Amino acid sequence: MAFQLTPLRVALVAGEPSGDLLGASLLGGLHARLPASSRYYGIGGPRMSAVEFDAHWPMEKLAVRGYVEALKHIPEILRIRGELKRQLFAEPPDAFVGIDAPDFNFGLEQALRGAGIPTIHFVCPSIWAWRGGRIKKIVKAVDHMLCLFPFEPELLEKAGVAATFVGHPLADEIPLEPDTHGARIALGLPGGGPVIAVLPGSRRSEIELIGPTFFDAMELMQQREPGVRFVVPAATPALRALLQPLVDAHPSLSVTLTEGRAQVAMTAADAILVKSGTVTLEAALLKKPMVISYKVPWLTGQIMRRQGYLPYVGLPNILAGRFVVPELLQHFATPDALADATLTQLRDDANRRALADIFTDMHLALRQNTAQRAAEAVAHVIDSRKPR
């Protein structure tokens, strides 16, 4: 390609941990594909920073979930976007890659595209599930979409948006056969009774809303299944500090609280109770039975319900096109209901085997060498815009 010997500048913006994972994967591919002296900068997290990315702002500044919750953060978010836009206009990159975070990135991408800067968006918003009107924003903002799921490019191309299915880096990273025994050894949980991983979210607001309910459900599960053990991974030291009082308030629970190591915790588990999000896909790739749940403030929930198209919210169910694991959302997410559903997932061996087959098929479909495919797509966009 024309730029083989020319250093490039690629700006990227990720707004939450799942985007940081995707960004790190893409950066790995770009380092292998583009000239060694190329520069990568913008907004990202620790995974991206670990692969020679210059984070001008930490992604935590953008990690706000929900309509109502975002209102108080709007001034700072707009200030950051304005400063970043001025930087990118002053020194235009060869390409801009927005990684998820559509509410932040689409407006920025539209402005950059209008200035002649190639725009790529990594992660197609779930227009097939809710807020389908966003396709109009995509058409205005995005030159090329990198899609995690195989059915997405056709939807975008019908609207006139170029798109490439690149798979999911988690499917490349996670082995087809999880090492449950090795994970238990790593966590200090060899032998003993069954293990349930409990993941109440990766944001303070999520844990504050659903954490107490999850811990009450754990108390009920231990009463109904003596010998059961729990492992709760906290995404950050701050979230571990937030979870510790919940552990202290339930002294009879057999619970291991870890910092990070969510994948190890899920690998060690016989079943998982998990807040809806990308982590549910990770649980599926680990072939684990699970119960998916969430709670959001009432107004946010009403808006989401009115704008939704599908009867399910969890990625395993969306990818399967049907309910393969239970979902207990909002007022249905009671401690008693969560305990019953999770113990059913734990005890039903026939269901466990059926889920393993379903999740293996998903795994194989998403295992596409995402880093290489995504980097090739970005390189193609850059090359197509270079003067000949």
Swiss-Prot record:
Superkingdom assignment: Bacteria
A biological process term (GO) from this entry: lipid A biosynthetic process
Keyword Lipid metabolism included in the entry's annotation: yes
Keyword Transferase: yes
Catalytic activity: a lipid X + a UDP-2-N,3-O-bis[(3R)-3-hydroxyacyl]-alpha-D-glucosamine = a lipid A disaccharide + UDP + H(+)
SUPFAM superfamilies in the record: UDP-Glycosyltransferase/glycogen phosphorylase
Keywords from the UniProt entry: Glycosyltransferase, Lipid A biosynthesis, Lipid biosynthesis, Lipid metabolism, Transferase
GO cellular component terms, A-Z: membrane
Pathway: Bacterial outer membrane biogenesis; LPS lipid A biosynthesis
Disulfide bonds: none
Annotated EC: 2.4.1.182
Assigned protein family: Belongs to the LpxB family.
Function: Condensation of UDP-2,3-diacylglucosamine and 2,3-diacylglucosamine-1-phosphate to form lipid A disaccharide, a precursor of lipid A, a phosphorylated glycolipid that anchors the lipopolysaccharide to the outer membrane of the cell.
HAMAP family assigned to the protein according to its UniProt record, in alphabetical order: LpxB
Protein name as it appears in the record: Lipid-A-disaccharide synthase
Organism: Burkholderia mallei (strain NCTC 10229)
This protein's encoding gene: lpxB
